[in-house]
């Protein structure tokens, strides 16, 4: 693949003359420029005064780092002059209504995974672009299927922008010399079936039975019903996990569990689950709570949390079957289902 096609050129071709699409183009271009500035900050780390120390908590109760605040402001500044009706940031309690008559509204998580800064693990920016309804304040009470565009940026060994405009998924890599994003992956397709899973297994005792059953099945490997050996991955960075799935498949799970405050998972529907689900589905994968398609969910509140299971479509469907089929009746303590339970033939 030639790496000479820039993000700006790609957006120009896809936008055409349509005013709505051109508004999306302008927003994505501005978000990409903001991402370059955020990438500069994350690359410099302590040299830019970034320590990773907590600066308090955001309105949702999560620890807020200095870089969260700085990234939030960089994105706001980049979008402020554009025809955008509403901004919604994970770092802010309320909507920021800019221009109610504008055609699009943008939600974003300015720095996902900022708790990883001190350990030099990839962090990222996630965004979602919605059409503005007649009542602009209802912009983010639409199902995820209404999204016009979604993307995320990974600030890692490379800075990569992953984007869908509803016509497949492209990957752009930042050329640090020219300071532009260039196309490096087009029409990405997630393998339908894969042998990697990502979940924080330290929480196993808190999981619902279907999640436990699925992971136990993976751990049985070739001796279990799947007949395949699995590898486990857990980075603790949503953007890094999603990028890996786009490139080589697998399944990511951040389920709800029995702990206080975790019943509905921890990831935000508007800022994280909706955009990730749109991207993953556009690349041929699946995204679900285990019981419901993520893109069908209508937010009940701006900062609503949901369980998120995403990745290779066959893996996701298998876990959905465990939530809705007869497997939910399995004994909770069947040891890896190796000698009893419905998984053994």
Swiss-Prot record:
Provide the cofactor note recorded for this chain's UniProt entry.
Answer: Binds 2 magnesium ions per subunit.
Q: Which Gene3D superfamilies match?
A: 3.40.190.80, Fructose-1,6-Bisphosphatase, subunit A, domain 1
Question: Per its UniProt entry, which superkingdom is the organism in?
Answer: Bacteria
Q: What does UniProt give as GO cellular component? A: cytosol
Instruction: Return the PROSITE patterns for the record.
Output: FBPASE
Question: Catalyses which reaction?
Answer: beta-D-fructose 1,6-bisphosphate + H2O = beta-D-fructose 6-phosphate + phosphate
Per UniProt, subcellular location reads as: Cytoplasm
Q: In which pathway does it act?
A: Carbohydrate biosynthesis; gluconeogenesis
Q: Which GO terms describe its biological process?
A: fructose 1,6-bisphosphate metabolic process; fructose 6-phosphate metabolic process; fructose metabolic process; gluconeogenesis; sucrose biosynthetic process
Major location (coarse): cytoplasm
User: SUPFAM superfamilies this protein is in?
Assistant: Carbohydrate phosphatase
Which proteins does it associate with, and in what oligomeric form?
A: Homotetramer.
User: What name does the UniProt record give this protein?
Assistant: Fructose-1,6-bisphosphatase class 1 2
Source organism of this protein record: Nitrobacter hamburgensis (strain DSM 10229 / NCIMB 13809 / X14)
